[in-house]
Curated annotation (Swiss-Prot):
A lyase-type mechanism (elimination/hydration) is suggested for the cleavage of the lactyl ether bond of MurNAc 6-phosphate, with the formation of an alpha,beta-unsaturated aldehyde intermediate with (E)-stereochemistry, followed by the syn addition of water to give product. The keyword Lyase applies. InterPro entries: Etherase_MurQ (IPR005488), Glucokinase_regulatory_CS (IPR005486), MURQ/GCKR (IPR040190), SIS_dom (IPR001347), SIS_dom_sf (IPR046348). This is N-acetylmuramic acid 6-phosphate etherase. It comes from Francisella tularensis subsp. novicida (strain U112). Its EC number is 4.2.1.126. It holds the Pfam family GKRP_SIS_N.
Length: 294
């Protein structure tokens, strides 16, 4: 039996049948045009994406974690999104977690066969002490990866919330999740190479999940990353500029309050907006569940 026969990501793209004989310029134009399918796929899944983000936000607000899990490109994209959150939002590295079939070494070198064992998905979730407060986001472009199915089955068994993200309709993994996103950008220019449009589609979904979940817990003021962690010179300067933008003060004043606030952008903004000292600003934030109220 051909298990890939009816999977969207395995179909041939009629527009790229002669990819091997196109000029580079023609192929570039084709690949650019094909990306429009990504946006259409996301628009079609607007309601489902919204429901997932409401669920991930609920988990974070109630002390849970967002756990991405996938194999190959899907797993790497989950890790990529997860590791960007601590410097951007000053969250713990355990708040948004990325797991990949085959372990960390699989991020840079493919681990053959790791995705084919459902038990590995279960074991990886057990290794991070998954709880019912957490939400597990299974990612599989083909919608059928055993590693992801095993993870979702285990998550369901302990009462964790489950999400399935795929790039094919009637995906097998959707049957194992409370919420599902089936965003289908169309056949790949290079048949079956889901690191292309499917990967782009998944990355944009993860961007929305992490960013808007962080907005929901007060990590953003207006459209400013007020909980940024200033770990290098660029981020230090960005921190001061954020204070300027949020409060209207000049650079020198922003720098002064940045230091007074122990290099916390959020606290500095509250100090300026409320004309108060450091301790009072902390109390205001605590009273507002760490949201800046203008």
């Amino acid at each position: 039996m051909n298990i890939l026969e009816n999977i969207n990501t395995e179909k041939r793209n009629p527009r790229s049948l002669h990819l091997d004989s196109m000029s580079i310029a023609e192929a570039v134009s084709l690949m650019i045009d094909e990306e429009y399918g990504v946006i259409e796929a996301l628009k079609e899944q607007h309601r489902n994406i919204t429901e997932v983000i409401l669920a991930t936000s609920y988990s974070l607000k109630n002390g849970g974690r967002i756990v991405y899990i996938g194999a190959g490109t899907s797993g790497r994209l989950g890790i990529l999104d997860a590791v960007e959150c601590p410097p951007t939002f000053s969250v713990d590295y355990n708040t948004i977690v990325g797991l990949i079939a085959g372990g960390e070494k699989a991020f840079i070198q493919a681990q053959e066969g790791a995705e084919d064992d459902a038990n590995f998905g279960k074991e990886d979730l057990q290794s991070i002490n998954l709880t019912a407060k957490d939400i597990v986001v299974g990612i599989a472009a083909s919608g059928r990866t055993p590693y992801v199915i095993g993870a979702l089955e285990y998550a369901n068994s302990i009462g964790a919330t489950t999400v399935a993200i795929s790039c094919t309709k009637q995906a097998k993994i959707s049957k194992y999740a409370k919420y599902s996103i089936e965003a289908v950008p169309g056949p790949e220019v290079l048949t079956g190479s889901t690191r292309l449009k499917a990967g782009t589609t998944q990355k944009l979904i993860l961007n929305m999940i992490s960013t808007l979940s962080m907005v929901s817990v007060g990590k953003v003021y207006q459209n400013l990353m007020v909980d940024v962690k200033p770990t290098n010179q660029k981020l230090i300067e960005r921190s001061k500029n954020i204070i300027c933008e949020a409060t209207g003060v000049d650079y020198t004043t922003a720098e002064k309050f940045y230091l007074k606030a122990n290099k916390s952008v959020k606290v500095a903004i509250v100090m300026i907006l409320n004309d108060c000292d450091y301790e009072k600003a902390l109390a205001i934030l605590k009273n507002n569940n760490n949201f800046i109220k203008s």
